Amino acid sequence: MKPSSALAVAFGIVLLTDLALGETPPERKRSDPPVIQSSWDDLLEGVETLEDWRKHREVLKTRFLELLRDDQKPEKPPLELEVHESVTVDGAYTRKLVSYNVEADERAHAYLGIPLKLEGKAPGIVALHGTFPKGKERAAGLVDNPDKAYLDHLSRRGYVVIAPDHFVAGHRIPPEGPYETGRFHQKHPEWTAVGKFTYEHSIAIDVLQSLDEVDPERIGALGHSLGGHGTIFLAAYDERVKAAACNCGASFFRHNPTVEAWARDHWYVYFKHIRPGLLEGNLPPIDFHEIMALIAPRAMLDLSGLNDGIPLTQRQRILMLMKVMDVYELEKAPQNFAFYVHGRGHSVAHESRQLIYAWMDTHLKPPSATETRLVTE
């Protein structure tokens, strides 16, 4: 039977089946793809050239720093890095509990993972935990969910990893409980929690770069949930981050029915100063597509679940990410941006972890680490 005859027979069978089911087959015409428009288009409004973007980027960076209240950060103290304990894990890497100064009267604790068999200097990773009281312990694979044991996983892959406590978790849980920011705001009434943790995560990069084992030019950052959007903020803030991966980071400001969660009046308060505006229906002058675009042309991977939170808000995330890609294309670096959308909710499932780690390998290791080879026999 000729291909055209077979196609006609198949079409006839489909037609008879539709008629038998009482349905008339739809008439479908050829069409060109429509232009996709969204509110996220304002990212490049008035921008035609790379030079235009670079000028607009400076405006956005200023707005970002104002959102953080970065001018309220304290003077950075000397690190004075101390090692409190050191153990060898499976003959693969050394795990150290360390502390270092983040303010004149405040020290942060973190776990460091340093591979034992290094050939030359290694890339360094800042691994940020989610909202969990013992976050650095979870990142080290010592408690809770081993899916989130980034320090353990990546140290075995040849990375030097620092997993710091969030500033109201671990060794610095306030008397009121984990993630209570009241005392922080009493100490720094004009600063923001996001400004505080971003500043501290930048100091974690200082720690990595102070180590003989680390190549200071190959620094990455990754995290889940609170650590996910913490990664976005850090990569936008500190250009030493060459590769970033945000897993299930929080929702943005627009198209978010629960936007007040960014400025609660209790417990963990991200941005205290924007609460009056939010209650009046006014959003900050910068949103997440603009913050994420500040990372370009450096490598950025976003992973999210369509069923992680409000369904329509999560679908807006895809439109937002498509617009961020336009910036990477303008920067002639589309290979440095990617996003992965799944249906596994608020998780770091196996395939997500493999994608994150491969992303780091691609952008922080030499090409030989990821190249494929033909079979010779």
Predicted regions mapped to residue ranges:
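Cap/lid segment of the alpha/beta-hydrolase catalytic domain
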Residues: 120-121, 126-210, 257-258
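Bacterial N-terminal signal peptides
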Residues: 8-18
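N-terminal pre-domain segments of enzymes
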Residues: 23-70, 369-377
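Primarily recognizes the serine-hydrolase "nucleophile elbow" in alpha/beta-hydrolase
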Residues: 203-275
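C-terminal catalytic histidine-bearing segment of alpha/beta-hydrolase fold enzymes
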Residues: 322-377
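N-terminal cap/lid segment of alpha/beta-hydrolase-fold proteins
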Residues: 72-120
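Conserved strand-to-loop "acid loop" that flanks and positions the catalytic carboxylate
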Residues: 296-314, 343
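Mobile cap/lid helix-loop segments that gate and shape the active-site cleft of serine hydrolases
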Residues: 188, 243-291, 313-321, 329-333
